[in-house]
């Protein structure tokens, strides 16, 4: 009797485990948005095919939850490794969003004063004809010149943000601070250097302490091309014939605050959720994050802390950011009132392209 009972238990266990299907950890898929997600997949795959992008990941958040996240294509063409939603990719200019959060948190804590000068924190920085206050840097209104092509992709090893200041610190300002918007990576890199000096901590440590650990963004770190990083996808570029090739070696550490962060679509979507809902960001903090500044002629800035501020054709507020760097690119789109966040990242050099996320947003918005 005991033997028969034991056999029945074993059979029951085998039936239970035999009937279990392996969970697909490469995707999050909320069936209540099935139609919208299928249209999203179609649009994103079409975008990748048109632009010969080997791989990417995409994520969508609605009302505080990730409703869709997936890796599509290849993380490595050479090794035929599929892209997953966890793979890390270069996000280019979108890195500024993380830098601005650290900056505003340091202001909130009283460690940085927006009205203090750059020279107050970096005494060796040359004096300028006009007061160069910190508050101009995250708005790209400092008058610091735009980087040249060769400065965007310095050859060799460039491990220091502080060393990267030498490219521009002795140049004259192109206009009085606060007059015009001119996007330059030098603004964000200088802001990162100031934060390092004020806190006596390196930028990767600040990113971890003020953003990724608190918000549990497990796949967002500063890139370091000279060491292995688990989950980092391979990077690709295109030659003169439009053929996809391996991207050349590029050490982005000197521009970590502006272009040098690795992340993925899901972490970007989680960042959007946190900005909209997390207690870590007070209402006052969020207002400052998206607050335009005044420009010459009583105009308002179109950017704030790395975010493009705009409205769509239906009059809805939209906050967006896109980025491109050697071997990668990304974009994030937020509709605050609709609690909608859309993000993607790819492993091919692309121009700053917001088109895919705007097209996808239409599937989730009621006109």
Regions found by a protein language model. Give the residues of each.
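Sec-dependent signal peptide recognition
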Residues: 3-10
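C-terminal motif of bacterial Sec signal peptides marking the signal peptidase cleavage site
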Residues: 16-19
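Short, conserved catalytic-motif segment at the N-terminal edge
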Residues: 30-89, 113
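Short, gly/Ser/Thr-rich active-site loops of penicillin-recognizing serine hydrolases
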Residues: 312, 317, 349-367
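Short, well-ordered beta-strand elements
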Residues: 331-348
């Amino acid at each position: 009797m005991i033997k028969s009972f034991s056999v029945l238990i074993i059979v029951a266990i085998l039936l239970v485990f035999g009937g279990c299907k392996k969970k697909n950890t490469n995707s999050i898929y909320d069936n209540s948005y099935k139609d919208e997600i299928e249209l999203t997949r179609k649009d994103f795959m079409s975008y990748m095919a048109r632009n010969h992008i080997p791989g990417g990941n995409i994520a969508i958040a609605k009302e505080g939850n990730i409703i869709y996240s997936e890796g599509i294509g290849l993380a490595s063409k050479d090794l035929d490794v599929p892209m997953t939603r966890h793979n890390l990719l270069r996000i280019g200019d979108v890195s500024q969003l993380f830098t601005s959060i650290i900056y505003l948190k340091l202001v909130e804590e009283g460690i940085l004063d927006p009205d203090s000068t750059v020279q107050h924190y970096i005494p060796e920085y040359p004096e300028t004809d006009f007061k160069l206050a910190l508050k101009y840097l995250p708005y790209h209104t400092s008058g610091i010149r735009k980087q040249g092509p060769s400065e965007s992709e310095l050859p060799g090893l460039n491990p220091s943000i502080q060393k990267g200041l030498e490219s521009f610190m002795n140049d004259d300002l192109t206009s009085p601070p606060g007059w015009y918007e001119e996007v330059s990576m030098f603004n964000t890199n200088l802001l990162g250097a100031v934060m390092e000096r004020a806190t006596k901590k390196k930028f990767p440590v600040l990113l971890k302490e003020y953003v990724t650990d608190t918000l549990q963004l497990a796949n967002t770190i500063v890139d370091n091309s000279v060491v292995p990083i688990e989950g980092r996808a391979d990077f690709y570029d295109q030659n003169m014939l439009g053929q996809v090739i391996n991207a050349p070696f590029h050490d982005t550490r000197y521009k970590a605050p502006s272009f040098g962060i690795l992340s993925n679509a899901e972490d970007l979507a989680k960042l959007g959720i946190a900005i909209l809902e997390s207690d870590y960001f007070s209402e006052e903090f969020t207002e400052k994050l998206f607050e335009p500044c005044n420009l010459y002629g009583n105009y308002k800035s179109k950017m704030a802390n790395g975010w493009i501020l705009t409205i769509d054709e239906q009059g809805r507020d939209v906050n967006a950011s896109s980025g491109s760097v050697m071997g990668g690119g990304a974009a994030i789109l937020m509709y605050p009132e609709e609690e909608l966040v859309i993000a993607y990242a790819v492993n091919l050099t692309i121009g700053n392209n917001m088109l895919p996320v705007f097209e996808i947003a239409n599937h989730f918005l009621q006109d």
